[in-house]
Regions:
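Active-site-proximal alpha-helical scaffold in enzymes
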Residues: 1-41, 77-90, 176-197, 244
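Active-site-proximal gating segment of KS-fold condensing enzymes and close homologs
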Residues: 1-4, 9-10, 148-161
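Short pre-catalytic strand/loop immediately N-terminal to key active-site residues, enriched for Gly-Thr
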Residues: 8-15, 68-73, 166-176, 230-233
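Acyl-CoA/ACP chain-elongation machinery
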Residues: 36-56, 61-65, 72, 98-112, ...
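Condensing-enzyme catalytic core mediating Claisen C-C bond formation in acyl metabolism
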Residues: 60, 64-128, 137
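Short beta-strand-to-turn element immediately C-terminal to the catalytic PLP-Schiff-base lysine
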Residues: 84-89, 126, 157, 218, ...
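Flexible, low-complexity linker/loop segments at domain and module junctions
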Residues: 132-134, 213-250
Length: 250
């Protein structure tokens, strides 16, 4: 086996680095026969700087985050770490598509119409050779802030037309910042490895959906998603957007 040191970096929300490590370095190394495997992931812990920064922006929730509801107090910061092992050898789940974009709209606010997010999603679909209707579930970035949720759903509605099941698992993990990319994607991979995704409803008892958002496709009831192509999105500060598609290996 060939082992190679690739790179170490820090990007907002972690998803961009996870994607870049695979697509710009790790993937080509494997395809060229220069490496047998690539390990990619992220980690983050509670620290004063992000806590104070999000508080200064007015988006730090004092309670559990509630993405896509009419009462979105902001983000709840989580703590986490994860690694993924990608190999040339076939495994139960494969990374079939990825897309990334940088819309450069603002340092901390997403582009209101989600054009950059849409470009990343369409890029992932194109690379995977799939159509929007092939995707059985989308794990939204879904931070629970007003601007992020509105921008992301605008993009998803244009791509998927409300026909694809979607929700945000940050309701349960919080926003793990530098670990968010691997946390969000890892939940999907684990589900595919164990026969499907058992997903709770996006809105728990006492939570009211924000009906000003295009919520078609958002899970209002618990669902069992059969194995198939799934997507995870991460939309970071500075307009750094990524989308990953995983599917069972036939």
């Amino acid at each position: 086996a060939t082992a190679r040191a690739l790179s170490r970096s820090r990007t907002a929300c972690g998803g961009k680095y996870l994607t870049s490590c695979l697509t710009r370095v790790g993937g080509p190394e494997i395809e060229a026969g220069l490496a047998d495997a690539v390990i990619a992931g992220g980690a983050d812990t509670f620290a004063d700087m992000p806590l104070n920064g999000f508080h200064a922006l007015g988006v730090l929730a004092g309670e559990r985050t509630r993405p896509l509801t009419d009462h979105r107090p902001g983000i709840t910061i989580g703590e986490g770490a994860g690694l993924m092992l990608f190999t040339r050898r076939p495994s139960a789940v494969k990374l079939s598509g990825w897309g990334e974009s940088s819309d450069g709209h603002h340092m901390s606010s997403p582009e209101p119409e989600g054009r950059g997010a849409e470009a990343a999603v369409r890029g992932a679909l194109s690379r995977a050779g799939l159509t929007p209707d092939d995707i059985v579930y989308v794990n939204l970035h879904g931070t629970g802030t007003g601007q992020n949720d509105a921008s992301e759903l605008a993009a998803m509605n244009r791509v998927f037309g409300g026909r694809t099941a979607m929700s945000s698992t940050k309701t349960y993990t919080g926003h793990t910042l530098g670990a968010a990319g691997v946390t969000d994607a890892g939940l999907l991979v684990l589900g595919l490895m164990h026969g499907g995704l058992k997903l709770p409803a996006q809105f728990s008892e006492g939570q009211t959906p924000d009906e000003t958002l295009p919520l078609s496709g958002v899970l209002r009831e618990p669902a069992l998603i059969a194995p198939g192509p799934v997507m995870s999105t991460n939309l970071a500060f500075g307009g750094s957007n990524t989308a990953l598609i995983f599917e069972p290996n036939s």
